[in-house]
């Protein structure tokens, strides 16, 4: 399969595309729910309908969030984003490389901070029961795939590899630093330990 870098649809049809951007992911502000739409004049009818819908759905964002957003949108984030992507790729690749096996179907993360492993050697009545067993036996908390519309009988779980101090990690690397196991053991020990425990659970009978 040939993978090509993602391209934004406005590059092909700017007059028929609206752009939505939010701070929750790239700015690590998950609870803020702040973002914006850029809508071309050709879609003014859509814009007007969305304004009506928005006015009936939520009120204005709190002042502290607005001030923080102004600071965020007026700063240069190149170094931050480069380091964040490097760290998440390093952590995600580590988890992937340690979990992939004949007993686990898993795809490498192409962005973000989630993996969706399928444990094909496990036989539970549903993925929720499987995740309960993982938590009980390893202390690793995963969400069942059924919570995301996947078949309950599929032993799939969503794994988030973000249980580490990102600020501390960033402060101790440069943009060209290679993320290896030594760094992960120092700045993401819970990831290393949790992955080891989960791998042990997979290999257990």
Kindly give the residue locations of the regions a language model identified.
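Single conserved hydrophobic/aromatic residue that forms the stacking wall/gate
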Residues: 1-16
């Amino acid at each position: 399969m040939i993978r090509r870098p993602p391209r934004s649809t406005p590059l092909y049809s700017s007059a028929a595309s609206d752009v939505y951007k939010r701070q929750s992911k790239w700015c690590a502000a998950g609870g803020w729910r702040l973002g914006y739409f850029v809508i071309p004049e050709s879609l003014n009818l859509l814009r007007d309908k969305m304004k009506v819908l928005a006015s009936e759905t939520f009120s204005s964002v709190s002042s502290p969030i607005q001030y923080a957003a102004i600071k965020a949108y007026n700063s240069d984030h190149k170094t931050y984003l480069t380091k964040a992507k490097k760290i998440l790729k390093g952590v995600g690749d580590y988890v992937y490389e340690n979990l992939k096996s004949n007993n686990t179907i898993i795809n490498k993360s192409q962005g973000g901070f989630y993996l969706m492993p399928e444990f094909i050697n496990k036989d539970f009545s549903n993925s929720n029961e499987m995740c309960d067993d993982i938590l009980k036996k390893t202390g690793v908390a995963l969400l069942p795939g059924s919570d995301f519309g996947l078949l309950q009988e599929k032993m799939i779980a969503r794994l988030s590899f973000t249980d580490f101090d990102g600020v501390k990690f960033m402060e101790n690397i440069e943009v060209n630093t290679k993320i290896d196991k030594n760094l992960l053991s120092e700045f993401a020990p819970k990831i290393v330990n949790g992955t080891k425990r989960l791998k042990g659970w997979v290999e257990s009978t």
